[in-house]
Amino acid sequence: MEKDIKIYIDSTRYEVEASLFSGESDEDELLQIIENAAAPEPEKMEIKTLGRLVSDSFKTEISYDETEITGMQGSSTVIFFDKKDIGTVTMMRTGQVSTALVFEKGQRHHCVYSTPYMPFEVCVHTLDIKNHLDGEGTLDIDYIVEIRGARAERTKFSMRISE
């Protein structure tokens, strides 16, 4: 099945005092650091855009073009997952900004985030993921991302799709 869709994304980002690269923090320790942090006001972003849904019996893929709002204009994003493992979601960006981020609850993944200026090593730790894209048309990911040498951020990403 292939069809055009409407995509609604809500994203909230918080700065946190944690290092994912050290590999020393377990999930309980990370959650305690996050909960006890006195973070400044979160940064919120809402995006409404058009995209494409491609789904077969093996995988589901949602694609859309990034906008000026995200600061990644000129890039395209594809979010996909294997239907046998809906708890692992991959987000690939190509264009001005490119990366492949893997989200899997309780897991830490290292990735490269390429910008027009230079590539950065990124570590992503997924706290929670609720993937209902094939049913209710929603995807919620709660994760921490850290660019090596920079402050970590917790992001709560929520996507809703409709026809």
List the predicted regions and their residue ranges:
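Generic short beta-strand segments
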Residues: Y8-E17, D65-T67, H125, D142-I144
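Acidic, glycine-rich flexible loop segments
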Residues: M92-G137
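A short, structured loop/turn motif at beta-sheet edges
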Residues: L53-S57, D82-D85, S114-Y117, D134, ...
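Short, hydrophobic/aromatic-rich segments at coil-to-beta transitions
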Residues: M1-K6, D56-S63, T88-V89, R108, ...
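Short, well-structured hydrophobic secondary-structure segments
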Residues: A38-Q96
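Charge-rich, low-complexity N-terminal segments
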Residues: M1-L53
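A short, surface-exposed beta-strand/turn
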Residues: D26-E29, F81-K84, K156-E163
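Mixed-charge, glycine-accented linear interaction segment located at domain edges/termini
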Residues: K130-E163
